[in-house]
Amino acid sequence: MQRYAVVLAAGKGTRMKSKLYKVLHKVADKTMIEHVVNSVQQSGADQIVTIVGHGAERVKDTLGDQSAYGFQEEQLGTAHAVKMAADELKDREGTTLVVCGDTPLITADTLNALVKHHEDNQADATVLSATAPNPFGYGRIVRDEEGRLSNIVEQKDASEAEQQIDEISSGIFAFDNQTLFRLLDKVKNDNAQGEYYLPDVLSLILEEGGKAEVYHTNDFDEIMGVNDRVALSKAEQAMRQRINEYHMRNGVTLIDPSSTYIASDVIIGMDTVIEPGVHIGSGTQIGEDTVIGQYSDINRSTIGDRTTVKQSVINDATVGDDTTVGPFAQLRPNAHLGNEVKVGNFVEVKKADIKDGAKVSHLSYIGDAEIGERTNIGCGSITVNYDGKNKFKTIIGKDSFIGCNTNLVAPVILGDDVLIAAGSTITDDVPNDSLALARSRQTTKPGYLNKNKE
């Protein structure tokens, strides 16, 4: 059976008190709408329609061609929002999921279980419910004496008795697609909020003698809606715990999970150790037997096996196997470190290729450069790559030694087995097997200070 999904993402999110559109706030380094759409995709939806309103273009920029779009100009309720998908889905046969764009913790497994329950029971509609520790603000699941769904009552329309019910509607549904779009036009807005409620479709189904089911999940966190910064923080904590537990169960040691932040798409090999205070952002892959030292920040980068990163910042870079980075190093975009490389304390690398076995141990800037195998860069060495207008490249061959406090003024090429004397400013190319010395000769005047004291 074909499966479709409508993702509701048109609400402005006033309670967030933000200039940023609500579903674009991030949880675990990814926007809420991306989390939801990814889960819907993983659940096997053949087509997704995202309903946008406020901030529509930014949502489209975020999701791109992962979804088709419907536009809700006025926020007149959830049933009205789903109607905006009619052009894409109205005449299709199959099951349609309706999912809220502000439920970033929902998983593909739960969506699949909801659809399976719906289809196995040949229902016209099925609502996903949960037991809430504090049900205030949620629609309540009202059951009849036999435990079957009788109604879904929104908070503002609930009686005192109904407000005591702790089984709540998640706002996530599975519908027979043609039944859904046939009944949407019959939904009325005679309620406390003057809105067209999607749960009223279930009431219409029951009135017609159709079948409406409830599928209950035991994990309330999955269906938690994020409407303000407090809920955003709770979602972040829950997502972080889920992600961290996943990695620990797959052979990764997290010394202090409560202070470790790992994005949802990060890949980490077994027997790697993550120390406290580490942030690993989206698009990062880390190998096996590696140590990521405390307070390191790594984003969109690849780190190899048996490598150690100590208190460093790495963005859009690659680091090979058996390599050491830090402490207090910065790898900027397009920094590429080979195997058995050392980049030490207070070294900055940008758009540079440092080959296997090379060392840049202290207080250096390596930018727009290529460093050959086993070359050693002395303390305080700088590739002078910028003339105020353009960037130029420095190339250093293999097995070379660059003395301390040197300036390599690009464009410049240094060959293999080259020795650059400490304190030199190199402006010309240096051929293989050469010594280059470019500094003033030392002048010493014995007794000079004694003469000045007389």
Curated annotation (Swiss-Prot):
InterPro entries: Bifunctional_GlmU, GlmU-like, GlmU_C_LbH, Hexapep, Hexapep_transf_CS, NTP_transferase_dom, Nucleotide-diphossugar_trans, Trimer_LpxA-like_sf. GO terms for biological process: cell morphogenesis; cell wall organization; lipid A biosynthetic process; peptidoglycan biosynthetic process; regulation of cell shape; UDP-N-acetylglucosamine biosynthetic process. Mg(2+) binds at D102, N227. It is found in: Cytoplasm. Pfam families: Hexapep, NTP_transferase. It comes from the Bacteria. The active site is at H362. Its cofactor is Mg(2+). Pathway: Nucleotide-sugar biosynthesis; UDP-N-acetyl-alpha-D-glucosamine biosynthesis; N-acetyl-alpha-D-glucosamine 1-phosphate from alpha-D-glucosamine 6-phosphate (route II): step 2/2; Nucleotide-sugar biosynthesis; UDP-N-acetyl-alpha-D-glucosamine biosynthesis; UDP-N-acetyl-alpha-D-glucosamine from N-acetyl-alpha-D-glucosamine 1-phosphate: step 1/1; Bacterial outer membrane biogenesis; LPS lipid A biosynthesis. GO terms for molecular function: glucosamine-1-phosphate N-acetyltransferase activity; magnesium ion binding; UDP-N-acetylglucosamine diphosphorylase activity. Residues 230-250 are annotated as: Linker. The keyword Magnesium applies. Gene3D superfamilies: Hexapeptide repeat proteins, Spore Coat Polysaccharide Biosynthesis Protein SpsA, Chain A. PANTHER family: BIFUNCTIONAL PROTEIN GLMU (PTHR43584:SF3), NUCLEOTIDYL TRANSFERASE (PTHR43584). Catalyzes the last two sequential reactions in the de novo biosynthetic pathway for UDP-N-acetylglucosamine (UDP-GlcNAc). The C-terminal domain catalyzes the transfer of acetyl group from acetyl coenzyme A to glucosamine-1-phosphate (GlcN-1-P) to produce N-acetylglucosamine-1-phosphate (GlcNAc-1-P), which is converted into UDP-GlcNAc by the transfer of uridine 5-monophosphate (from uridine 5-triphosphate), a reaction catalyzed by the N-terminal domain. Homotrimer. This is Bifunctional protein GlmU. It comes from Staphylococcus carnosus (strain TM300).
